[in-house]
Amino acid sequence: MLMQNQVTKRAVGEDTMDLKLHHINLSTNNVAGMSHFYRDILGLKTETQDLPVLEKNKGYDGDVTFVSDGQIQTHLAEKDVNVGFRTGHIVNPLERGHIANRTDDLAAFKAHLKKKGVAFSDWDETAVAGWQQIFFYDPDGNVIEVHQITS
């Protein structure tokens, strides 16, 4: 089993880059209740490492709690159906939540998506300082994030 900080190179189509599951974001109108459930019922621990620095003055200032099983983070974020409108992005990762992968080469991953004809919304560092983020949809409309650490 891979630990969170271990990364394996894997082929993404014809391309190769580091890409690993980083977190799952669940959007909620009850962050405190969700935090209680995930900590007290599922036994997840409050996460204190490798956390995003939220840019609360750039369009999203909701409450977020971070928990983890020691490998994968779960971000419990206050639902915000209008954050896409306020920030000028077509994909809203805080309406229904999303799953997030981390890469070491976001430019290569964006080129890969373009080559495959997958449209994406480039948030750059709009929401998180030091994280360049893109968001796109899978075939069923689930939101996927891929980000790269920049600092």
Put a short name on every predicted segment:
Residues 2-17, 20-30, 62-68, 86-151:
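Vicinal oxygen chelate
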Residues 16, 56-57, 65-66, 90-91, ...:
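Short secondary-structure boundary/capping segments
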Residues 51-56, 82-87, 122:
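A short, acidic/glycine-rich surface segment
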Residues 70-74, 81-83, 106:
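Short, charged/polar surface micro-motifs in flexible loops or helix N-caps
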